[in-house]
């Protein structure tokens, strides 16, 4: 909602008639974005989601709203949806015609505000006297959430470490072990919101620590779980 209101404000300030928001989802993001932007003047949202790979509840949360929310089912996986969104943004003619932006974490206006609740969580734990050596465990798919926490850490948030929790789409977990980043087609799991085979925020994490694998592993450890474990 913060991003929706912020975008609406700048649309009014710049005198634009309408901005079109593209968002790829593996489940949770589509629901959150659709409800956050529902009815916001000057914005139309297009939610791209993989056919048969989101839960019925999640699907109903962004396909039944109408108004300024349009859902587009894609015959593929989340990574295909994300690739379509990225292709749209590098098409200059399409951008000029449709005035595109994104509500995925490829847009810094999406993930930077997420850093706020890491500070809030730390403040609450400090009040309870439990903030020493605080470790944050973050379920991770496209890695926007944990990247926001790492940005907060760079801003001075005194969190000791982060744990990136993956399902069997464990590309980042394997990177932590080997130092090699090898994207793969995503596999469908019970934790479908984390079914990402090429997390777009890996590049931000990599750049944040200047590609230093030792430094990355000193702040982030990984965990991976099968459907049976979940």
Segments from the language model and where they lie:
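PLP-dependent amino-acid enzyme catalytic core
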Residues: 1-230
């Amino acid at each position: 909602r913060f991003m929706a209101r912020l975008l609406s404000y700048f649309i009014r300030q710049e005198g634009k008639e309408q901005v079109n928001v593209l968002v790829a989802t593996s489940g949770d993001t589509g629901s959150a974005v659709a409800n956050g932007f529902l009815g916001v003047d000057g914005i139309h949202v297009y939610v791209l989601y993989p056919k048969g790979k989101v839960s019925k509840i999640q699907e109903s949360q962004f396909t039944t709203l109408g108004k300024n929310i349009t859902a587009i089912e894609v015959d593929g996986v989340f990574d295909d949806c994300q690739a379509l969104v990225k292709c749209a943004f590098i098409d200059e003619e399409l951008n000029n015609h449709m005035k595109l932006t994104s509500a995925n974490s490829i847009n810094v206006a999406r993930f930077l505000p997420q850093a706020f609740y890491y500070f809030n969580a730390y403040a609450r734990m400090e009040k309870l006297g439990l903030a020493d050596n605080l470790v944050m465990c973050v379920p991770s798919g496209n890695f926007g959430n944990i990247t926001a926490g790492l940005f907060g850490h760079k801003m001075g948030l005194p969190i000791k470490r982060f744990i990136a929790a993956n399902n069997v789409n464990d590309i980042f977990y394997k990177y932590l072990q080997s130092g090699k980043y090898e994207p793969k087609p995503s596999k469908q799991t019970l934790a479908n919101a984390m079914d990402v085979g090429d997390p777009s925020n890996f590049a931000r994490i990599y750049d944040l620590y200047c590609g230093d694998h030792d430094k990355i592993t000193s702040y982030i450890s990984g965990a991976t779980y099968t459907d049976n474990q979940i």
